[in-house]
Amino acid sequence: MEIKKNNDYELLIEDLTMSGEGVGRIDGYALFVKDTIPGDRVIAKATKLNKNYGYGRLMSVIEPSKDRVEAKCPVAKACGGCTLMAMSYERQLEFKRHLIENNLIRIGGLSGIEVPPVIGMDNPYRYRNKAQFPVGTDKDGNIVMGFYAGRTHSIIPNEDCLIGSDINAGILAEIKAFMIMNHIKSYDENSHSGLVRHVLIRTGFTTGQIMVCVVINGSSIPKEDELVKKLLALSFSNERKIASIMVNINREKTNVILGKKCRVLYGTPYIEDYIGEVKYRIQPLSFYQVNPVQTEKLYNIALDYAGLTGNETVWDLYCGIGTISLFLAKKAKKVYGVEIVPEAIEDAVTNAKLNGIDNAEFYVGKAEEILPEKYDKENVHADVIVVDPPRKGCDEALLDTMVKMAPERIVYVSCDSATLARDLKFLVGNGYEVKKVQGVDQFCHSGHVETVVLMVNTKEE
């Protein structure tokens, strides 16, 4: 059958992409359809056609999948965030387990590896400790706060995201009322005019400390003291309170949310939080895992896989603000962390001091440059190497150096099981064996899943 653009087709959704689009086939031709899940029988309009695959828009669901549920969020379809919210949570976890397993086999050539069920959450809502709300104006001139629709910069009004903290709505309502009362305009990215661009809210789930950071296209907000008073007058359940109110200055014509300069209006330039027994100091620009409940599970698995006895030297690559490094340092002889972002390393050093940890040392730079240089010039040693790279995975130069260093164990923490599988294939081809694999659901209702892998050196001494 010839597939024609703008024609409607009936198809059975058989699979999902990592981005959460359903995959159906018309005589073998794959059509990706948003807002569908496996088992749905749908009518879809073909909107964009390539040689071997195309995209369709959901017109109607003829017969819903047994795994389809009513999304709790009223804007789930329009918002670009929770692509899997119409799928039962149990099925989401199975989809993610299958995704990991399939990538290991298809990309890594690693068949026969047991992939156990993904570790999910008892309550997969209200789990995010950070939210960034763009601020704009609707067609009627009203201030709107919410999230961008998928692949656009069109704001979907939503001040109470169900995967975010329940404190967000009250804070946003107060800021919006303040803006209206004082005739403060929201930012327009087309004309580069207006003042308020974003509102960033961070919460320490264990400490109850809250940070409110208003991102502005200017140097100050009119009547800042009044805004501070209004925010501090808010009350929150479970003894949570605002510990930091800041402005972040971003005058650039850019899609980057935060500028480099912050100014404190109240409290400290940071909040604090714990993962396990380790305390972390978090600033507006700090990278910090957004799901603290699952992060603790993830790090405990990584720590278990590392098999530390107190005598090991560990290298933690792509260490960020030292979140995993400091977990490891409590059980290791020495930990070296490497991270490309200077500010993150400053946070890592601060966090080490905050916890009285003196056996962690940090380097600024690319992991694929620092580790080979240290190995070639100083012949550094590693009993265990932990890697937690970005989605693109590890550079081959880094993997090559890791193999040369021949640690007993490699613990690979991945946010993309496709690049994970590619890198594991290299390591398996160079003397390492995959011993354990575990998925952890850090981003409930999205297509993303974190995976932890233990590899052991099989080469003879």
Residue ranges and their predicted role:
Residues 2-7, 18, 222-461:
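Rossmann-like S-adenosyl-L-methionine
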Residues 53, 207-211, 447:
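Conserved loop-to-beta-strand segment in the C-terminal subdomain of adenylate-forming
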Residues 59-71, 77-186, 206, 221:
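Extended interfacial segments that mediate partner engagement and assembly in macromolecular machines
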Residues 116-124, 189, 198, 439-442:
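Short, solvent-exposed loop/turn elements at beta->coil junctions and helix N-caps
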Residues 193-206:
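Short edge beta-strands and adjacent turn/loop segments
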Residues 201, 208-217, 279-283, 384:
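Short, aliphatic-rich beta-strand segments
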